[in-house]
């Protein structure tokens, strides 16, 4: 009897010791119990219990999916109001900004004024440039590996297309933007803010760096370029953008990045349909 009593007392002592050890954690859990009301699925569970369908897997799945969709929609719109941007979240769809950002990264965007945009300013108060090719008022200059000095980037592009110049993308780089009528040159750097605009020619949002901002007679505009070493030319010298991007066509500038979480969407909704499409369509796909 004494032995049994001793064992019982030891067991009770161990249980008290264990309870005392975990008590702070339980207290913290109780302290932050109110956070459950921030979880939208708490309300989904309450709804299912109220209608008596929580054990019905089909109805439960439908309610949970609807809850997830509505929660994402509300969060998206809330971020839009918070960041003053109609498109607060955008997925990087190509590698044109590597190593700054990678395909599948999600960028959070905010609205801003021209003064707040970090990029060299060019004043052209007497010139209207909306809808004009940039060759009407400026041109970019490129360096080519093995060639001394700089030459107009569009001249380099023509030589590459004709076969007169055999180089890889890494061997060519846009270095300057020249505004001959103003006697002004701007070095192309990676110090400007990253902005997002919709490319009419490509049908996708472009996430590139602002390399110059222009205050013209007919409004504000931005010149852009990707950071990647494989992205040799500014957007306005390629098929991404016909002219300088009007300020009101910008969706926002990036304020922070969430890595990789957009990759699932790209694989399921972009890559897979492209992979299964015709050869003509497949050639336009943005594969990694």
Language-model features, listed with the residues they occupy:
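Extracellular/periplasmic catalytic domains that process cell-envelope and extracellular macromolecules
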Residues: 100-102, 187-189, 201-203, 215-217
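Short coil-to-beta transition motif at edge beta-strands of beta-rich domains
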Residues: 120, 181-199
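PDZ peptide-recognition modules
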Residues: 122-125, 198, 211-213
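Extended, hydrophilic extramembrane loops/domains of integral membrane proteins
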Residues: 211-269
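Protein maturation boundaries and topogenic segments
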Residues: 1-179, 257-288
